[in-house]
């Protein structure tokens, strides 16, 4: 099972903001921009597909969601230096922040992806407690937003991404995840 926390295909999304799309050299924004970026990362992502699917099964999270986060955080590792990014604070494909967590495993291995995905599920559970009336799919989106900016930043469904990087984190990740789901994740 990989659907314990909802289904990414049922989540509404506005996709990448222009602040996210422009540095990627795109003249357009929104879901089409997210899909283009996800597509550019697909070849690199496919190197980790087996591990991503294994961790998704183990933790009951859609592998496509894990892939969406990996694309957004590190372009499937393409922007990392010796496994580090974000000015030396973020570790690995999922950019686990060493200021909040002790990074585990190698930057691109199963232990790391398990740690990052566990951090995600912890945030989803916090959002479930904070917003019990939201649907599972809404709580999943809230958890994705919290993965970037913390559970305290999620104040309402409509505005959950305000305060995330480029104010579009969950919307962009969800759109990328929908792309990866169409490509066997």
Swiss-Prot record:
The active site is at 73. InterPro entries: Glyco_hydro_23, Lysozyme-like_dom_sf, Transglycosylase_SLT_dom_1. It catalyses: Hydrolysis of (1->4)-beta-linkages between N-acetylmuramic acid and N-acetyl-D-glucosamine residues in a peptidoglycan and between N-acetyl-D-glucosamine residues in chitodextrins. Disulfide bonds join 4-60, 18-29. Its EC number is 3.2.1.17. It comes from the Eukaryota. GO terms for molecular function: lysozyme activity. The keyword Metal-binding does not apply. It is found in: Secreted. One of its GO terms (biological process) is killing of cells of another organism. SUPFAM superfamilies: Lysozyme-like. The keyword Disulfide bond applies. GO terms for cellular component: extracellular region. It is an enzyme of class 3 (hydrolase). Keywords: Antimicrobial, Bacteriolytic enzyme, Disulfide bond, Glycosidase, Hydrolase, Secreted. PANTHER family: LYSOZYME G FAMILY MEMBER, LYSOZYME G-RELATED. Shows preference for N-acetylmuramic acid residues that are substituted with a peptide moiety. It acts only as a glycanohydrolase. Belongs to the glycosyl hydrolase 23 family. This is Lysozyme g. It comes from Cygnus atratus (Black swan). The lineage of its organism: Eukaryota, Metazoa, Chordata, Craniata, Vertebrata.
